Curated annotation (Swiss-Prot):
Protein's organism: Spinacia oleracea (Spinach)
Signal peptide positions (record): none
Protein purpose: Destroys radicals which are normally produced within the cells and which are toxic to biological systems.
InterPro entries the UniProt entry points to: SOD-like_Cu/Zn_dom_sf, SOD_Cu/Zn_/chaperone, SOD_Cu/Zn_BS, SOD_Cu_Zn_dom
Annotated Zn(2+) binding sites: H131, H139, H148, D151
Protein known as: Superoxide dismutase [Cu-Zn], chloroplastic
Length: 222
């Protein structure tokens, strides 16, 4: 006889017997409708009106809830001068990253603002390396197709030396292989020419001059 056999009994009811090679006694765990059979296994007695086996769950199924994955990071910028500031980065799911900038102590006017490759500040802002550039492209403006991922353009300081800006960019995620967490944000001395100034440094740095202040991007509670 096969390991699993289905037998039909008298017309008043139908019995399904499941033969188990692992047990010599039936179990009483399912319900009172389970009966002992002449086989080593379980007998299921079915109602003659339905001739079917009904299974029910003790708990109603619950709808699937999808929670948006918000990620947030912060960088505190400091340098050798009185330039300092705080930058927050926020990303919803896999959408673009919103960067909120407030930096003080700057000369009025435009200043290059970039994400650099390393979060190393052992030698001040100089040890943060070049612009973050995973795709090995030349320097450009944030809206250009050809640009470094870390090219965030210019921020503008007012007459009080304070620069406030909101930047929305899709090349600086907070998760994944190109995550910017652990890298450094740097504010520069001069205006970034966005790769169009014709200077020998335009294709690499935008000829934005020295590095006034920098800070490492780190995750923070949402």
């Amino acid at each position: 006889m096969a390991a699993h056999t289905i037998l039909a009994s008298a017309p008043s009811h139908t019995t399904f017997s499941l033969i188990s090679p692992f047990s010599s006694t039936p179990t009483n765990a399912l319900s009172s409708s389970l009966q002992s059979s002449s086989f080593n296994g379980l007998s299921f007695k079915l109602s003659p009106t339905t001739q079917s086996l009904s299974l029910s769950t003790s708990a109603a199924s619950k709808p699937l809830t999808i929670v948006a994955a918000t990620k947030k990071a912060v960088a505190v910028l400091k340098g050798t001068s009185n330039v300092e500031g705080v930058v927050t980065l926020t990303q919803e799911d896999d959408g673009p990253t919103t960067v909120n900038v407030r930096i003080s102590g700057l000369a009025p006017g435009k200043h290059g603002f970039h994400l650099h490759e390393f979060g190393d500040t052992t030698n001040g802002c100089m040890s943060t390396g070049p612009h973050f550039n995973p795709d090995k492209k030349t320097h450009g403006a944030p809206e250009d197709e050809v640009r470094h991922a870390g090219d965030l353009g210019n921020i503008v300081a007012n007459t009080d030396g304070v620069a406030e800006a909101t930047i929305v960019d899709n090349q600086i995620p907070l998760t994944g292989p190109n995550s910017v967490v652990g890298r450094a944000l740097v504010v520069h001395e001069l205006e970034d020419d966005l790769g169009k100034g014709g200077h020998e440094l335009s294709p690499t740095t935008g000829n934005a001059g020295g590095r006034l202040a920098c800070g490492v991007v780190g995750l923070t509670p949402v």
